[in-house]
Every structure is written in C-alpha cells, then in structure tokens.
Amino acid sequence: MKLVAVTSCPTGIAHSQMAAENLLQAGERLGHDIDVEVQGAMGTQDELASDAIAEADAVIITSDTSVSRDRFDGKLVLKGTVKDGVNNAEAVVQKAVELAEAGKTGSVTFGSGDDGEDADVGADDSSDDADAAESDEPVRRGGDPEKGLFARLKKLFS
C-alpha cells in the first residue's frame, strides 16, 4: 500500500524528525511504501511530490502545529499528534492501512488527537484531552515561549 505522511512540531528539530523516522521504519517493516515530509521552524524537508500524493492510498499527519490539508482533498487523512508518530508509529500505519482497505475517505483523528471520530490508536491520553476540551481555557502546548528556539534566535540576532 502507498502512504504519505507529514510530521510537524513547533520547533521542528527533534520530535518531528523522530516521528518521521519511526513512520518510515514502521511502514517498511509492515511492507508498505511510505514517503514522509517534515515541517519545522527551518522550513520543509523531503516535501511530498504531487505524484506521490495522487498515488497515495492514505495520508498520515502527526502534527502539533497547523498543517494545510488542501493538497490532500479526496484522500483519507488520519490526524494525530507528533507523540503518536514517535510512540505509536506502527499502530498509526496499521490504522491507515485498515481504513484505506475499508474504502474510507475524509478526515479521521486518532490517538491523542483532539476531536476525532476514531481514537483507539494510542488512546491512553484520551481522558486528558476530554477534560481539556470541556474547559473554556485554551490548551497550551510546548514550553516557556521565552526559552524556545525563536526566543533564542531573536536574542542572537538582536
């Protein structure tokens, strides 16, 4: 089966790279052809070709940031967090294959994602997300913004 994936995190240095590597290894181990694009603070690496997207049976997005889905119209798109890609890559690939073989299209959120129809991949964090969704306060991800990559770069260049 042909799969494409996009990983992205706010800094794009470690976690998105680890998720990409784990998804590649899991796809190969399960006998599937998978291409992975990494989006981070420094731009996009291994950008998915339009041909690869057109041939794909499913799209996997493991991201803690916003990823444009326009180029994936008409495809099965599975959305989860970078944590899902790092910790549960094999289960994520298996879920994508299962849904694609069933002929599903559209968007499905899995794992520790926020609002999906299907949350059984890596569901150990689902109760935390349900509590966060019920409160009126926004969910904040990441560390202290004063200590992040952008803050350090700003200090370096000012």
Swiss-Prot record:
GO terms for molecular function: kinase activity; protein-N(PI)-phosphohistidine-fructose phosphotransferase system transporter activity; protein-phosphocysteine-sugar phosphotransferase activity. The modification Phosphocysteine is found at C9. It is an enzyme of class 2 (transferase). The active site is at C9 (phosphocysteine intermediate). Its EC number is 2.7.1.202. Keywords: Cytoplasm, Kinase, Phosphoprotein, Phosphotransferase system, Sugar transport, Transferase, Transport. GO terms for biological process: phosphoenolpyruvate-dependent sugar phosphotransferase system. Residues 1-98 form the PTS EIIB type-2 domain. Coiled coil: none annotated. Residues 104-147 are annotated as: Disordered. Its main location: cytoplasm. Induction: Expression is highly up-regulated in presence of fructose. It catalyses: D-fructose(out) + N(pros)-phospho-L-histidyl-[protein] = D-fructose 1-phosphate(in) + L-histidyl-[protein]. Residues 114-136 have a biased composition (Acidic residues). PTS-type transport systems are very rare in archaea. NCBIfam families: FRU. The phosphoenolpyruvate-dependent sugar phosphotransferase system (sugar PTS), a major carbohydrate active transport system, catalyzes the phosphorylation of incoming sugar substrates concomitantly with their translocation across the cell membrane. The enzyme II PtfABC PTS system is involved in fructose transport. This is PTS system fructose-specific EIIB component. The gene is ptfB.
